Amino acid sequence: MITMSVITLAICLWAILSTRKLEERPGKAQNVAEKIVEMLLNFLTGIIGRDNARDFLPFLGTMFLFIVISNYSGILPLAGRVPGLAAPTSSLSITGALAVCTFLYTHYVGIRNHGRHYIQHFTKPVIFMLPILLMEAFIRPMSRTLRLYGIIYGEEAVTMEIASLAPALAPLALHALSLLLGFVQAMVFVMLSCVYITEAAGEAH
């Protein structure tokens, strides 16, 4: 998908260019990057605490930026009308890939922190719980996939339909709604990911 490739490349280039020459007195690019990182760190700190926020910031921060920019790309003039230019998060395969990445990272953190004891917790309190706990582990990312996909796809479809009925008045109000929904959905996705990753990292396992 063209939009996804452009967004991914833009995030990578921004990260490289803004951190290439770090200085005591930051320039504009470094200053913007530091403000964004600080904002994301404070957001995560409010959910999972400072230590966990610092540990998981690279993954969760990148996830948040990708999702929110992808959501916002849906308000571009040709989005949804030209093949390859739809918002990436309106594609089930993309939202599924995001959920799979979170799923893998969650269990990586669990194994990193607890080793074989993390694997063993799927059999507690009794081994008969194994199928239920495995189903829960797979259902969690699936639910996030469907939630993000459904809302962004539905929002794009409704926006295009209403805009065609009232092209002079609808766009501004609908774009404002799209901006709000895009940000909220990125926050919800990352907040749920925070909960699952922190559970895997916690001492309960």
Please give the residue ranges for each predicted region.
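Selective transmembrane helix interface/packing segments
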Residues: 1-205
